[in-house]
Amino acid sequence: MQQRFKNWLFEGAYTPDGLTFDVGNATREALTRGHGLSDEYSNGNGSLMRILPLAFTEAGPSDVEAVSSITHAHATSVEACQLYVDIARRLLKGQQLSEILSGLETSKTYARLQTLAELTEDDIRSSGYVVDTLEAALWCLLTSTSYPETILKAVNLGDDTDTVAAVAGGLAGIIYGLEGIPDNWLAQLRHKELLESCLF
C-alpha cells in the first residue's frame, strides 16, 4: 500500500489529471523516507482525510493504525483515525451522531468530542492539526441538518477548509446518502464516470 501512495505522490497515480497538489509536509516526508512520522509535531490531518474507506471493511483498530502510520504514526493521528472509522460504522448502523459522541471513549486529547454540542463556532478551530480537523468536521455535522449545510459550514470556518469539508462530507454522505448531495455538485465532479464505475 505504501508503494501505491508513493505512486500517487511522485507519479500522479489515481488523480484525475496525473498531478498531485497541496500535499502535507508530513505526508511528503513520510513517503520520501519510506515510513510514517511518529513525532508529536507530525500530527497533520493527512491520514484522517483518507481513512474513511476502512469503515466499510472488517479492518480492526490495529489495521486502522497501520494504514494511518504509512504517513502519520503518532498516537494522536492514529486515535483520530480510529475514532473516525468507529463513528462512521456506528452511523452506518443508524445510530445518531449526538448519542455516539456523548458515549465516546477517548483519550484526554479528544475529550471535547463528548461535548461538541455545547460549543459555538467561536470555540471551533479548523486548522490542519488532526485534533482540530476532527472536532471541526464533527461539529459541522452535528450542527447541520443537510449535506449542503454541513459542507458549506465546514468551508466557511476558514483555515484548512478542504480537508475539514472532506472529513465532514464523508460522514454526511453516510447520513444523507447520495440523494442528499445536490445534483449540480455531482455534475461538476471531474472524472465522475470513473468514480461511478468504482462505486456502482
Give the positions of each predicted feature.
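Structured, active/binding-site neighborhoods that engage oxygen-rich ligands
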Residues: 1-200
